[in-house]
Regions:
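Ser/Thr/Pro-rich, acidic low-complexity intrinsically disordered regulatory segments
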Residues: 2-11
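An N-cap/entry alpha-helix motif that binds or orients negatively charged groups
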Residues: 15-59
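Gly-rich Lys/Arg/Thr-decorated short loops/hinges at beta-loop-alpha junctions or inter-strand turns
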Residues: 30-31, 71-81, 98-109
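Solvent-exposed alpha-helices and their adjacent loops that cap or buttress functional pockets
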Residues: 57-63, 68-70, 99-100
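Glycine- and acidic-residue-enriched helix-capping/strand-helix junction motifs
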Residues: 77-91
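Short beta->alpha junction loops
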Residues: 109-116
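N-terminal small/polar loop signature for handling phosphorylated ligands or for N-terminal nucleophile
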Residues: 118-124
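Conserved small/polar residues in nucleotide/adenosyl-binding loops
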Residues: 125-132
Length: 134
C-alpha cells in the first residue's frame, strides 16, 4: 500500500473519534419524564406487549432494522486470518455501508472462536432474536 494512502487511512480511522460506527438514541432523553418512559417504569409497557405478542417487538424495539456483521477473523476481506480484533475495522466498514446506503443499523461482533459450528450457534441460536428477520 502506498505510504500516503496508509497514513491517510490511519488518520481517517483514528480521528476525530476512533472507529466508523456509533450507537445513537432515536428518542429524546432530556428530562425525568423521558427517562421514565425510556427506562423504568415506562419500559415495562413495551415489555408486557412483547410478552403478550412477540411480533410487537418490531413496533417497540429497534430489532426490525438491526443486523449483525459477525467475524471470527479467519477470512477477512483479502487479508486472510488476521483474528477478530484486527478484523473489526472491516466489520465497521461494512456497517457504514449498511447505514449509508440502506439506513440499516448494524452491530459488529468480533468473536474469538475458531470452530465454525460454534460461531454459527452463537450467531443463529443465541443472539439472533435481537436482530431483524429472526
Amino acid at each position: 500500500m502506498d505510504e500516503r494512502i496508509r497514513a491517510a487511512a490511519l488518520e481517517y480511522h483514528r480521528t476525530p473519534k476512533p472507529g466508523k460506527i456509533a450507537v445513537t438514541p432515536t428518542k429524546a432523553l432530556t428530562n425525568q419524564a423521558d427517562l421514565s418512559l425510556a427506562y423504568s417504569p415506562g419500559v415495562a409497557a413495551a415489555c408486557d406487549e412483547i410478552v403478550r405478542d412477540p411480533a410487537t417487538a418490531a413496533l417497540y424495539t429497534s430489532r426490525a432494522n438491526l443486523v449483525a456483521v459477525i467475524t471470527n477473523g479467519t477470512a477477512v476481506l483479502g487479508l486472510g486470518n488476521i483474528g477478530p480484533l484486527a478484523g473489526k475495522p472491516v466489520m465497521e466498514g461494512k456497517g457504514v455501508l449498511f447505514k449509508i446506503f440502506a439506513d440499516i443499523d448494524v452491530y459488529d461482533l468480533n468473536i474469538r472462536q475458531l470452530d465454525p459450528d460454534k460461531v454459527i450457534e452463537l450467531s443463529l441460536i443465541h443472539i439472533s432474536r435481537s436482530l431483524a428477520s429472526t
